[in-house]
Every structure is written in structure tokens, then in C-alpha cells.
């Protein structure tokens, strides 16, 4: 065991101050909302397609699950396709000197970005979704 620290004799101790300090006032949160406290780091919200991927998976194959790594890959894939379609749609709108991206630009972008049969199915599903949205 380590040796104990020796006690100082009473003569060496500092005299206790007899002056009383004024009591601290109670702080009431004002306009700043109690900014004196430590601020918690705000979490940056991250938008993902994970819940939608899972819903589609359960519609197509109700008995099959998906690993977190596979889900991450699917999320990256959808983000990539979204960026490609958005970029192509923006180019088409610029070429035609239009300030707005409409369903027509999106449809043309789908035909340009996706290959063959996949583009045909995507266009038909997109048209069906737009029709359902406008009718409701």
C-alpha cells in the first residue's frame, strides 16, 4: 500500500475568511432558454429508403428477410438511380429552356437512363402512380 500523506500542523493551515459572500441569485431561464447548460449535439437526420425497401420486399416475398448490409447496398443503389434520373431530368429541362421538371422530363430520363425492358416497366409503373395520385 502507498504511504499516507502526512497531515499539516494546525499552524500552517490558512485562516478561514469571516466575510460572507453574497448568495447567488436564482437563474430563471429567459429568452435564451437556459443557454448556460451544456448543449446537446443535434443529431443530423439522415433520410433513407430502408422502410420502403422493406415494405416492397414484404409485398414481393413475405417470408424473406434482408441483412443490414444488403439493406445498405439497396439504399445506396436507390440513391444512385435517383441522382442519375434527377440529373438527366434537369439536363432535359435546361435543353428545352423550361424552369420546371415535369413528369414528361422524368419519363424521358427514365427511358435514357434505364436499359430496354426495365425502362418500359418503369414508365408503365410511373404512369400508373401519377394517374392514381392525380385521381385521388
Curated annotation (Swiss-Prot):
Can be acetylated to form H2BK6ac and H2BK33ac. Monoubiquitinated to form H2BK143ub1; may give a specific tag for epigenetic transcriptional activation. Residues 1-36 have a biased composition (Basic and acidic residues). One of its GO terms (molecular function) is protein heterodimerization activity. Residues 1-44 are annotated as: Disordered. GO terms for cellular component: nucleosome; nucleus. InterPro entries: Histone-fold, Histone_H2A/H2B/H3, Histone_H2B, HISTONE_H2B_site. There is a cross-link at residue 132 (Glycyl lysine isopeptide (Lys-Gly) (interchain with G-Cter in ubiquitin)). It is found in: Nucleus; Chromosome. The modification N6-acetyllysine is found at residues 7, 26. The keyword DNA-binding applies. Keywords: Acetylation, Chromosome, DNA-binding, Isopeptide bond, Nucleosome core, Nucleus, Ubl conjugation. Phosphorylation of H2B was not detected. The nucleosome is a histone octamer containing two molecules each of H2A, H2B, H3 and H4 assembled in one H3-H4 heterotetramer and two H2A-H2B heterodimers. The octamer wraps approximately 147 bp of DNA. Core component of nucleosome. Nucleosomes wrap and compact DNA into chromatin, limiting DNA accessibility to the cellular machineries which require DNA as a template. Histones thereby play a central role in transcription regulation, DNA repair, DNA replication and chromosomal stability. DNA accessibility is regulated via a complex set of post-translational modifications of histones, also called histone code, and nucleosome remodeling. This is Histone H2B.5. It comes from Triticum aestivum.
